[in-house]
């Protein structure tokens, strides 16, 4: 039996056609720990963070969390957030090594996406598609890794406070964002780090710039997955603009869960897309 597992930054709680499990990450702020599972109220999380003046941060899934997720199956595909900005992939690999000591017959492959959110969703959907074709485990791994090279990520943020506080971007870069409606448009680099590409003022200019960046990155009407942190209007406007260029494009919008809401902050929009 095949099982697909991803950390909670994929923003998925289920996936049609496969056995899927999300392994939660944790957001810590002051005296509160917010476990990023299906019970988390992301609106409450964002409100709490907006009122919180102290330090905050995130924690990757525990070794035990991964080990429990591995149980009950013999073929496992694991999808993680970029290893360049998180210890999640390393914790999954450590758990795999422990699990295989007592379950040597189980096959476990870990995909370090060098990305997050919607690009992880695209990979999950591709794995489900390949599994439905009845392909062998090793072939699925190979084809999925090839597919990952054809997907990309852009995002627009109204604030870089939490990213800067946790060392993901420089505090100098974060300082100018959010002032007078300035948004930052960025991408996931080939190394899985955050690469700013443009500053925009206002939602309309940000949307137009995002569409232009996708087109420049050779987007030709493939799948698009848009995740947002309480900004359905911007997500919808982006989808409508892309449909204006490619009316038949498969575009899906969903809200961010806890981890992506923490780093994208309220108003952030994250876009994963295919260029194949």
Where are these regions (language model features)?
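Acidic side chains
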Residues: 7, 11, 36-37, 74, ...
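Class I S-adenosyl-L-methionine
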Residues: 32-101
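A structural signal for short coil/turn segments at secondary-structure junctions
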Residues: 73-74, 103, 218, 246
């Amino acid at each position: 039996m095949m099982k697909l597992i991803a950390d909670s930054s994929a923003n998925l709680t289920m996936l049609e056609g496969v056995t899927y499990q999300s392994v939660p990450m944790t957001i810590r702020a002051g005296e509160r720990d917010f476990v990023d599972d299906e019970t988390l109220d992301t609106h409450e999380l964002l409100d709490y963070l907006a009122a919180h003046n102290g330090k905050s941060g995130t924690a990757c899934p525990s070794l035990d969390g991964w080990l429990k997720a591995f149980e009950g199956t013999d073929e496992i595909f694991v999808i993680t957030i970029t290893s360049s900005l998180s210890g999640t992939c390393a914790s999954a690999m450590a758990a795999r090594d422990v699990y295989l000591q007592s379950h040597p017959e189980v096959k476990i492959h870990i995909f370090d996406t060098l990305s997050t959110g919607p690009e992880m969703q695209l990979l999950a959907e591709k794995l489900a598609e390949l599994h439905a074709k009845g392909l062998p485990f090793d072939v699925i791994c190979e084809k999925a890794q090839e597919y990952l090279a054809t997907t990309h990520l852009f995002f627009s943020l109204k604030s870089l406070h939490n990213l800067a506080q946790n060392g993901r971007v420089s505090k100098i870069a974060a300082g100018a964002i959010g002032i007078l409606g300035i948004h930052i448009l960025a991408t996931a680099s080939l190394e899985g780090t955050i690469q700013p590409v443009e500053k925009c003022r206002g939602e309309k200019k940000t949307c137009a710039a995002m569409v232009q960046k996708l087109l420049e990155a050779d987007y030709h009407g493939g799948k698009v997955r848009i995740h947002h942190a309480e900004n359905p209007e911007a997500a919808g406007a982006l989808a409508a603009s892309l449909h204006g260029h490619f009316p038949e494009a498969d575009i899906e919008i969903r809200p961010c869960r806890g981890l992506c809401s923490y780093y994208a902050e309220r108003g952030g929009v994250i876009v994963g897309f295919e260029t194949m």
